[in-house]
UniProtKB/Swiss-Prot annotation:
Binds 1 [4Fe-4S] cluster per subunit. The cluster is coordinated with 3 cysteines and an exchangeable S-adenosyl-L-methionine. Its cofactor is [4Fe-4S] cluster. This is Phosphomethylpyrimidine synthase. It catalyses: 5-amino-1-(5-phospho-beta-D-ribosyl)imidazole + S-adenosyl-L-methionine = 4-amino-2-methyl-5-(phosphooxymethyl)pyrimidine + CO + 5'-deoxyadenosine + formate + L-methionine + 3 H(+). The lineage of its organism: Bacteria, Bacillati, Cyanobacteriota, Cyanophyceae, Oscillatoriophycideae.
Length: 461
């Protein structure tokens, strides 16, 4: 779809959506996004120019259906997939991608760290994906030196980053905010550093006693991103890995650096969103969102969860969806899903489904709470269908129609029950929604109540 659009931009030194927006240009991607969001296209352009919204759209990802991430638009959900050294291959990752797109992922991140040829896996995912693809290039950089972290150089990082950009990656997690002076700040934590990328860079800095090469070469990364319109997803290497560590000095020190890097990228018209925690108690979520907006000049916030408790392995799609709904309500632009396998193992396609549905619920709940235009229309339509016992319509409007139908049909599978005015919970005699009160009856009741009230007033007099 985008091949003709991007062909007109060939040869330009900066092809970012922010660059065009700041020139007053409305790109085809902006127009497409405005229609998807049901928002004025001028608003889309202005929000992108301001940096409060990004449209992740690498010029080499031509089969992309453009979308946006920002506080003015609907709350978005990302799904993580990716092969590990111990599990998965290309076909399994493509199945996860298909599952993620089917159940409404707005973006997908390929977090492959092994399982075969990483370039082959990534290019297959990009070719098959209509949604933006994000990556964490430091994983492949480490693989390129056979896991010997101390052998990594700045050129290794830049080479892999440019390769991902050439292949069509729309946004990349760049862990440029963790600095050597931040490392002593984690000494009082329970879980230390839980970011894989952050952990790699921390070990590199401790080994070499040198500053983070992604920080010192940040301007070189900006130049790559300008040429392909790759968006920064500034990684939070020092995010808390448990509720005890939330909002601590290490996390907030890195956040301040991320704000500085955000504004540095904006000076070159490169799009930025900022990643956030993690594990955060419910009473600290509002603070975290507002602090990010303050430090990062309202760049879109992209949070992992956050998990609001640490005691539910196997159910962390629930512990985190609670925090995600709250974060979305307070203004987070995109939620990174957590699956039931979090902290336990590599998710499969069914885990992707369960995690994604939990997060679609959280994002939708946030949209309703923020009174985004049309957010509740689907809820109202489903409620009407429920009251009218229109089972097929209820299934159709559900976030997961297959699961809704499956649960209904476990006990009442026959077609006749698709028109029945009850389900197996209440049966035919106890369903309260069978109590249909017509308008005439309510009018008569109102007259009676008014008359009774008047008589009582007279009696008091």
């Amino acid at each position: 779809m985008r091949a003709d659009w991007v062909a007109k931009r060939q040869g330009q030194s900066n092809v970012s959506q922010m660059h065009y927006a700041r020139q007053g240009v409305i790109t085809e991607e902006m127009d497409y996004v405005a229609k998807r969001e049901n928002l004025p296209v001028d608003l889309i352009r202005d929000e992108v120019a301001r940096g409060r919204m990004i449209i992740p759209a690498n010029i080499n990802h031509t089969n992309l259906e453009p979308m946006c991430i920002g506080i003015a638009s609907k709350c978005k959900v990302n799904a993580n997939i990716g092969a590990s050294p111990n599990s998965s291959e290309i076909n399994e990752e493509l199945a996860k991608l298909q599952q993620a797109v089917k159940y409404g992922a707005d973006t997908v991140m390929d977090l492959s760290t092994g399982g075969g040829n990483l370039d082959e896996i990534r290019t297959a995912i990009i070719k098959a994906s209509p949604v933006p693809i994000g990556t964490v290039p430091i994983y492949q950089a480490l693989e390129s030196v056979h896991g010997n972290m101390e052998n990594l150089t700045a050129n290794d990082f830049l080479h892999i980053i440019e390769k991902h950009a050439q292949q069509g990656v729309d946004y990349m997690t760049i862990h440029a905010g963790i600095l050597i002076e931040h490392l002593p700040l984690v000494k009082n934590r329970i879980t230390g550093i839980v970011s894989r990328g952050g952990g790699i860079l921390a070990r590199w800095m401790l080994h070499h006693h040198k500053q983070n090469p992604l920080y010192t070469h940040f301007d070189d990364i900006i130049e790559i991103f300008k040429r392909y319109d790759v968006s920064f997803s500034l990684g939070d290497s020092l995010r808390p890995g448990c509720t005890h560590d939330a909002s601590d000095e290490a996390q907030l020190a890195e956040l301040k650096t991320l704000g500085q890097l955000t504004r540095r990228a904006w000076e070159h018209d490169v799009q930025v969103m900022v990643e956030g925690p993690g594990h955060v108690p419910m009473d600290q979520i509002e603070f975290n969102v507002k602090k990010q907006m303050e430090e990062c000049s309202e760049a879109p916030f992209y949070v992992l969860g956050p998990l609001v408790t640490d005691i539910a392995p196997g159910y962390d799609h629930i512990t985190s969806a609670i925090g995600a709904a709250m974060a979305g309500w307070y203004g987070t632009a995109m939620l990174c899903y957590v699956t039931p396998k979090e902290h336990l193992g590599l998710p499969d396609a069914e885990d992707v489904r369960n995690g994604l549905i939990a997060y679609k619920i959280a994002a939708h709940a946030a949209d309703i709470a923020r009174h985004r235009p049309g957010a509740r229309d689907r809820d109202d339509e489903l409620s009407h269908a429920r009251y009218n016992f229109d089972w097929e319509k209820q299934f159709e409007l559900s976030l997961d129609p297959e699961r809704a139908r499956e649960y209904h049909d476990e006990t009442l599978p026959a077609d006749i029950y698709k028109t029945a005015e009850f389900c197996s919970m209440c049966g035919p005699k106890f369903c309260p929604m069978q109590t249909k009160v017509d308008a005439d009856a309510l009018t008569e009741l109102e007259k009676y109540l008014a008359s009774t009230a008047a008589k009582e007033e007279l009696a008091k007099a």
